[in-house]
Structures are given as structure tokens and as C-alpha cells.
From Swiss-Prot:
Part of the 30S ribosomal subunit. One of the primary rRNA binding proteins, it binds directly to 16S rRNA central domain where it helps coordinate assembly of the platform of the 30S subunit. Belongs to the universal ribosomal protein uS8 family. It comes from the Eukaryota. Pfam families: Ribosomal_S8. This is Small ribosomal subunit protein uS8c. InterPro entries: Ribosomal_uS8 (IPR000630), Ribosomal_uS8_CS (IPR047863), Ribosomal_uS8_sf (IPR035987). HAMAP family: Ribosomal_uS8_B.
Length: 129
């Protein structure tokens, strides 16, 4: 059984990117679904869909003739053994605003930009660039 579903999701995306695979299948949780929505709205993935009750399929994006991945890096920040919380003033900017931080706040899971606009802090789930 998977202990950290978010880390598993990020690892599956990272491995598929390295192999230039277009679709990734993973177990579906409510947090994974919300992260998939954020990845799609921010333009990091092409699309996502629920394949069944228990699985989620992401379609990854590549650019150019050499099929370079849009996602160059994914990093899990807050883990089960070491939680990382930030205040509204400490919300991280990834690569000076070129990347995205996904933060779990009291108003739900959102990007770093949304958290700054709403003046919310929370748990930093992962960084994407």
C-alpha cells in the first residue's frame, strides 16, 4: 500500500516525463484530483480524466520536434515526516514566478499566486518548474 499518495503521483509524472510517455495512470484521491486540476489550469499538463472510480489519467505536454517536456522539475516539499508550513508573507515563489508552488490552505488546495492574492498561508505540498 502506498503511504504518500502525493509523492507517488509526482514520481509517476517525473518518470513518464523522463521516458516521454504521454499518459500516466495513477490511483485517484481527492488531493490528486485537485492537484491535477491545478496542473491543467496552470498549463503544466494537457488534460486529465477519471478513468474509473479508483484511477486518474493525466495527459502530459511536450514541446517542439524533440518532444522536450514542459515539466522540468517536480519536488515534494512537505512530507509525512517533516511538514512544512508557511505564513501568507512566506509563500514561496518558484523560479521568480516562472514555476508553481501548490499549497494546502484553509480554503482548499491552491497555487502560490492564489494564496498570495487571498493572503493565505498553509502547508507547501510541492514545487513545480
Amino acid at each position: 500500500m502506498i503511504q504518500d499518495t502525493i509523492a507517488d503521483m509526482l514520481t509517476r509524472i517525473r518518470n513518464a516525463n523522463a521516458m516521454r510517455i504521454y499518459t500516466v495512470c495513477m490511483p485517484m484521491t481527492s488531493v490528486a484530483r485537485e492537484i491535477a486540476v491545478i496542473l491543467e489550469t496552470e498549463g503544466w499538463i494537457d488534460s486529465w480524466k477519471e478513468a474509473s472510480v479508483n484511477s486518474l489519467i493525466l495527459r502530459l505536454k511536450y514541446r517542439g520536434a524533440k518532444q522536450q517536456p514542459i515539466l522540468t522539475g517536480l519536488r515534494r516539499v512537505s512530507r509525512s515526516g517533516c511538514r512544512v508550513y508557511v505564513s501568507a508573507k512566506e509563500v514561496p515563489k518558484v523560479l521568480g514566478g516562472m514555476g508553481t508552488a501548490i499549497i494546502s490552505t484553509s480554503k482548499g488546495i491552491m497555487t502560490d499566486r492564489e494564496a498570495r492574492n487571498h493572503r493565505l498561508g498553509g502547508e507547501v505540498i510541492c514545487l513545480i518548474w
